Design a protein with these regions (language model features):
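Short loop/turn segments at strand-loop or loop-helix junctions that form parts
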Residues: 1-2, 153
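Short coil/linker segments at helix-helix boundaries
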Residues: 2-119, 131, 160-169
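TPR/Sel1-like alpha-solenoid repeat signature
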Residues: 76, 117-124, 136, 151-158
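Short connector loops at secondary-structure junctions
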Residues: 108, 149-152
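Short helix-capping/linker turns of helical repeat alpha-solenoids
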Residues: 112, 146-148
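A broadly tuned preference for mixed-charge, low-complexity surface segments
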Residues: 133-139
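Solenoid-like repeat scaffolds
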Residues: 140-144
Length: 169
């Protein structure tokens, strides 16, 4: 796969990986594998399949590469590409709620999720995307050391008067 080819280059002496290609293929993997799981689950629901055949394998594969999303998000954020940063951090933070990972304890119980949610909130804040700020900062504010960043983003989002009910946070 494109992901495997570029990822291998990261670990070879003198290897130059095309990180844009690597990270974009990573996002596509999440998109396609999730869609594949949805289609398979629909076939199970309709009785066309007795039980899912791919879910475990898809979940394991994505759980293995999921930490790379933080690198992708960090690189994008540091380059000032907040839209991509939000995409990658968002994929990371959204994973525990994805039914595909229902049996993946490492994903469901990931203690880094609130920290990464802070970064997603910061990227969303830079984009003035208040809906995403509220979505991710609500998770990020639970992080003991970095939660204040999400609270600041929430204060800014709610302070703009778009959501008058500030008691939510």
């Amino acid at each position: 796969s494109i992901y495997d080819d570029e990822n291998m280059k990261l670990y070879l002496p003198g290897g130059q990986a095309d990180t844009a290609k690597l990270y974009n293929s990573l996002a596509k993997m999440f998109e396609y594998y999730t869609k594949c799981d949805e289609v398979e689950q629909a076939k199970v629901q309709s009785g066309e399949l007795k039980k899912p055949k791919l879910r475990k394998k898809l979940a394991k594969t994505l759980a293995t590469v999921r930490p790379q999303l933080t690198n992708a998000g960090s690189d994008a954020y540091n380059a000032g590409n907040y839209a991509n940063a939000l995409k990658f951090f968002g994929l990371y933070v959204d994973a525990p709620q994805n039914p595909l990972f229902a049996d993946e304890d490492a994903v469901k119980n990931d203690t880094l999720t609130p920290l990464i949610a802070n970064y997603a909130a910061l990227a969303a804040n830079s984009l003035k995307d208040n809906a995403a700020v509220i979505k991710y900062a609500t998770i990020g504010k639970e992080h003991k050391e970095e939660g204040y960043r999400s609270l600041m983003c929430l204060a800014e989002a709610y302070g703009k008067g778009e959501t008058p009910d500030s008691a939510k946070w």
